[in-house]
Amino acid sequence: MVELSFSQLLVLLLSLLFLFTTLASSSKTPRFKYSLEKPHHPLDPLTTPEIKRVQTILSGHDPGFGSGSTIIHAMALDEPDKQRVIRWKKGDRLPPRRAEILAMSNGESHVLTVDLKSGRVVSDLVNPTFGYPILTMKDIIAVSQVPYKSVEFNRSIEARGIPFSGLICITPFAGWYGPDEEGRRVIKIQCFSKQDTVNFYMRPIEGLYLTVDMDKLEIIKIVDNGPVPVPKSTGTEYRYGFLNETVYMDRVNPMSMEQPDGPSFQVEDGYLVKWANWKFHIKPDQRAGMIISQATVRDSKTGEARSVMYKGFASELFVPNMDPGEGWYSKAYMDAGEFGLGPSSMPLVPLNDCPRNAYYIDGFFASPEGIPILQPNMICLFERYAGDTSWRHSEILLPGVDIRESRAKVTLVARMACSVGNYDYIFDWEFQMDGVIRVTVAASGMLMVKGTAYENVEDLGEKEDDSGPLISENVIGVVHDHFISFHLDMDIDGSANNSFVKVHLEKQRLPPGESRRKSYLKVKKYVAKTEKDAQIKMSLYDPYEFHLVNPNRLSRLGNPAGYKLVPGGNAASLLDHDDPPQMRGAFTNNQIWVTRYNRSEQWAGGLLMYQSRGEDTLQVWSDRDRSIENKDIVLWYTLGFHHVPCQEDFPVMPTIASSFELKPVNFFESNPVLGISPFFEKDLPVC
């Protein structure tokens, strides 16, 4: 029998994944086939030839890249200088192409910059900050095999009566909890039973936890608090073809939005999107999942293309679980910085994730060995019409005049979904013809649950578990938070001269006898001078609007052109600031931040997130208190929600969503969608 090495097994697994995902995507699905062998825009992601060239250059720089002792953890375009990108026009020569690589070699973190034209490594920073790069699939697969090498672990499993054939140990978590965990990459894992179910997340093997040295692949510590009943597999199935339950619900007929003339948007050169009055660049990203760049909107009155946002993306996704017990205290995930939203993305499912007439974009990332890996159907673009109204008015006070004006609201959605372990997240960037950009994050998938001996709340008595409610027999849904920090480099009619304005709604009391009213609201505006002026904690009883304006671009009435942030889901972190997870997730100390533009400040939790200590976070940058008035500035908003689980979240959660908007404020001279055409029956298909 031929024995395969771990590396051969990994390559085989990746090859099978490639084959599966390629076959899973419909041949009729409009998609970008990656036939391009060269980039067309300064912000285009690395092409497959470029990824291969980077691997060749790195092998020459460090023989370890060829032997496998040096591992690539992330590779992406090192974007050109912002002003150079802004000045670039189609037909111009592209700026020099560079790649940024996060790698590990001999236990040290490397941040390398490679010049693709010269073939040189122009920078190699070793351990620039405390922490390690994003995990690789190779890391996760290797760690999942470590428990079986331990006699102590195997005895613990046997004592619990769990068959090894039904065992799976693939949910890693780390964090940072003191100096005893420093100096090496540490990971903590818990195992589950997949016997009689694919939903192993609902069958945790509670009370048994392992700490592993990732580089030596050795167990550092085993904690065995004694057996806890493993929840039964009954009721854990969620796949449509395997559900045997009777559903007492009237069938809803299939539906889709028909477009007889095809979609209204265009995708040029793979990544440049044009729709209605919008134009923007979109690309897959290993860490952020999806990046929107150079979003411009055309003024419907003048035809001028005006800049709105240079770059927007999900910077970090922080999920702290609220159980301080052994084995649980470190389950506080930084999904973007520790796992990556790009590699966690799975192919979007046509007709269910994205509607008919959607257009799909693939992603390409580098494997630990520097080999291009395909992420098919990673992003989809589609037009949405859900029966909403863009604007309307009917008039009844003019005799003999029949006025019933209404316009349908059609939007363009860019969507990416990722499955980061048990949780699934759907990210939407939705562009509206009135200039609004709405960003929505939806969550589904499986809860992170805890095993318990109790099957009914009556069994608990006064021993109710503080970590969460009972959601099924022997299953506790652990309370947790979701915080998604967005990096929003807003460039309102230019990049070098924006300001952040806090518009305060202040209650004014009237003296007796002046009016029959006793109070009213008055608006006062405050221009933030420095970064600390723009550290905002939301409060319902101290309301503000938050505007980004260009004081040098005035409307005909003298108002500065601007956009405002319309917050949606707001939740404050209740953790102490010196709690280790909160130190790393310090960007949740406020809901809104504004910083001076710095191309190195992109990741709210820091560049090297894994086992970081909170020394390179948005909080640290903002506390430098740089001037932000009439400067190139970046808006940061953290969308958040607390999640107290319930029975409806079992075995898989119905999708919950939260959003925020970026909305024009005196940006246009009047309603920009006044002149859009209504729909008429004659223009629609008869189905």
From Swiss-Prot:
Residues that, per the record, bind Mn(2+): D489, M490, D491, D632, I633
Name the domain of life.
Eukaryota
Q: How is it modified after translation?
A: Topaquinone (TPQ) is generated by copper-dependent autoxidation of a specific tyrosyl residue.
- GO CC terms on record? apoplast
Residues carrying sugar: N154, N244, N497, N598
Alphabetic keyword roster: Apoplast, Copper, Disulfide bond, Glycoprotein, Manganese, Metal-binding, Oxidoreductase, Secreted, Signal, TPQ
> Its family?
Belongs to the copper/topaquinone oxidase family.
Q: How does it assemble?
A: Homodimer.
- Enzyme class comes to oxidoreductase
Tissues in which the protein is found: Expressed in roots, leaves and cotyledons.
The active site of this protein is located at D335, Y423
Q: Which EC numbers does the record give?
A: 1.4.3.21
Q: Where does substrate bind?
A: 333-344, 420-425
* Protein name per its UniProtKB record: Amine oxidase [copper-containing] gamma 2
Disulphide bridges, residue numbers: C169-C191, C354-C380
Q: Which InterPro entries match?
A: Cu_Am_Ox_Cu-bd (IPR049947), Cu_amine_oxidase (IPR000269), Cu_amine_oxidase_C (IPR015798), Cu_amine_oxidase_C_sf (IPR036460), Cu_amine_oxidase_N-reg (IPR016182), Cu_amine_oxidase_N2 (IPR015800), Cu_amine_oxidase_N3 (IPR015802)
Q: Which gene name belongs to this protein? A: CuAOgamma2
Pathway in which this enzyme or protein is active: Amine and polyamine degradation; putrescine degradation
- Signal sequence segment: 1-24
> What is the protein's major site of localization?
secreted
Q: How is the cofactor bound?
A: Binds 1 copper ion per subunit. Can also use zinc ion as cofactor. Contains 1 topaquinone per subunit.
Q: What induces it?
A: Induced transiently by auxin (IAA). Induced during wounding, dehydration recovery, and treatment with putrescine (Put). Slightly and transiently repressed by jasmonic acid (MeJA), abscisic acid (ABA) and salicylic acid (SA), and drought.
Catalytic activity reads: a primary methyl amine + O2 + H2O = an aldehyde + H2O2 + NH4(+)
